[in-house]
Amino acid sequence: MAGGRKAGRAGKAHGAKPAAAVTTKPTANGGSQAEESPVQHRFFEIRFESIGGLGAHAAGQILAGAAVLRMGLNGAHFSSYGSEKKGSPVRSFVRLGPANKPIRTSAPVESPDVIVIFHSVLLNIPTTLAGLTGQGTLIYNAPAGSCPPELARLPKTAKVVRVDALKIAVEEKSRPNAVLMGTLSAIFPFLTPKVLLEALA
């Protein structure tokens, strides 16, 4: 995408406790089963697709910063802009990784684990969904209604989550980017919800 770039690289956390290698999920008999964190051995990559003014750049900064300072991970973030005008397309990229694996690239995220779409109009742009695999997750902001036809381009095994971030933000006196980050942490528990809430405060 043409345009400028804002970068905010964060390195290894200093003085932070290492992130837990596993989380747990409930089982049918009421117990719990260990679930390996996706950042234990590799990078976990997120791409925020947005338009200027909706807070995607801030969301990326907060997420990467919280990962480094509060979760004991490595993290890096930068954004690219179609132009500096409000309402122009914005892409915000976040890479997270284990504390012992430095992040040495600032290349755009082309094969994301997660795509978060801040405005459903961006589904009309073919590159918005580019790179999402069958193991990936799409989170998109839209009111309740019929499924957008553009989602038919996704692999059938990809996870798709719709959230009416604007409605929730109004009801909770919050911001849509905070709602979308909360949705992200609900799906991926290694992004500790409490930690993100503290970072957003």
Regions from the PLM with identified roles:
Residues 2-201:
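Active-site cofactor/cluster-binding pocket
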